[in-house]
């Protein structure tokens, strides 16, 4: 079954995305490194769009898994289109991840590889491709441990870290927990995903579960953390299960409002649900550099909360935003009319419904319904 899933992702990827193979001359390493790069569909057409950058260590075997998932998930708009870069390390993995026996930080060839990533690779990619400031690092085993050294930077090079069955260096858990506690004082959002499995390398599973316990005690609204401990999977088979979960965690704010978000975050608000909607899309813009049009699904979720909690005054603000994001449709006038209806201004409600006559219908809101509502008000009040 796993074979067919991977085969499907491969053909799905090949059908839509553009794969580029690049070589980069590295002064830090004194050699050439091979890269695999997946560009988003319609990359050339969307010439003004900038994209999140996902850097995949162990690109020899991880790149296709990550690229296929990115292509599939972004197709359904549960994450933005992204640029995926895989670093081939089959012949240099041991040298790339070399650590000091004293402080267990990158050393010699490991330090050179760190410099390559920090000072050369990102600049090389961003000089050739349109990347936003949002970056994710993905590693497996030794490289899952290695990516954490970028997390320790004062201003981390990456916003998101995906550690798949990490083979932690000594003191790595303590250093991570200490760093996470320091980040409590900052407002910068960081994402961290950690996974292991019941059939994982025993040392890796033990350390991952211990780290998860420690991280779970930290209350930090700026850190978006997710942990998976899969049953019946091994060090290698956990990878294709982890990647979609990790991406879901990294890009959860980008996704349409679902039932869980609606019930836990919106219905329970004591403040404005409209402000929540605005903040959600401002966060998308700030994190990913994307001006995303507010989805009809999300307008409907906020409207449902207004109705459920009888907070009808918020309909006016919702209508103003709807007219800004969907000006050619009846949506904004519908919410404005509902505001007038529920605040004792039926004549203004009738006029608002009728103002939508020249506008287009949209996902359950038709101009015929608007006119029917206007006629019903006219009949009831005798205007």
Question: Model-derived features: where do they sit?
Answer:
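Bacterial Sec-dependent N-terminal signal peptides
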Residues: 1-20
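Non-catalytic cap/lid and distal C-terminal segments of serine-dependent acyl enzymes
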Residues: 18-346, 350-383
């Amino acid at each position: 079954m796993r074979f067919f899933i991977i085969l499907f992702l491969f053909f799905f990827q090949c059908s839509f995305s553009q794969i580029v193979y690049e070589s980069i001359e590295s002064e830090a390493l004194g050699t050439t490194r091979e890269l695999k790069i997946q560009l988003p569909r319609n990359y050339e057409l969307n010439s003004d769009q900038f994209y999140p950058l996902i850097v995949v260590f162990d690109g020899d075997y991880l790149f296709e898994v990550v690229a296929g998932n990115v292509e599939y998930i972004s197709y359904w708009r549960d994450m933005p289109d992204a640029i995926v870069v895989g670093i081939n390390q089959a012949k240099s993995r041991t040298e790339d991840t070399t650590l000091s026996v004293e402080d267990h930080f990158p050393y010699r060839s490991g330090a050179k590889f760190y410099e390559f990533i920090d000072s050369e690779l990102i600049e090389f990619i961003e000089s050739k491709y349109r990347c936003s400031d949002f970056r994710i690092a993905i590693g497996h085993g030794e490289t899952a441990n290695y990516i954490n050294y970028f997390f320790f930077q004062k201003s981390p090079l990456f916003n998101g870290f995906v550690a798949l069955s990490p083979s932690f260096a000594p003191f790595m858990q303590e250093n991570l927990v200490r760093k996470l506690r320091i980040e409590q004082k900052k407002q910068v959002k960081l994402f961290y995903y950690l996974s292991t499995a019941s059939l994982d390398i025993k040392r890796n599973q033990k350390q991952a579960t211990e780290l998860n316990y420690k991280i779970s005690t930290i209350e930090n609204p700026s850190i978006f953390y997710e942990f998976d401990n899969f049953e019946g999977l091994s060090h290698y088979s956990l990878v294709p299960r982890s990647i979609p979960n990790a991406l879901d965690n990294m890009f959860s704010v980008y996704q349409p409002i679902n039932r869980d978000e609606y019930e836990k975050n919106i219905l329970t608000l004591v403040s404005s649900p409209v402000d929540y909607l605005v903040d959600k899309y401002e966060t998308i813009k700030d994190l990913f550099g994307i001006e995303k049009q507010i989805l009809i699904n999300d307008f409907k979720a906020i409207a449902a909360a207004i109705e459920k909690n009888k907070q009808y005054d918020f309909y006016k603000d919702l209508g103003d935003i709807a007219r800004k994001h969907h000006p050619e449709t009846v949506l904004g006038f519908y919410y404005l009319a509902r505001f007038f209806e529920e605040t004792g201004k039926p004549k203004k409600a009738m006029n608002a419904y009728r103002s939508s006559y020249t506008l287009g219908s949209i996902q359950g809101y038709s101009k015929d319904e608007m006119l029917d509502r206007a006629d019903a008000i006219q009949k009831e009040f005798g205007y």
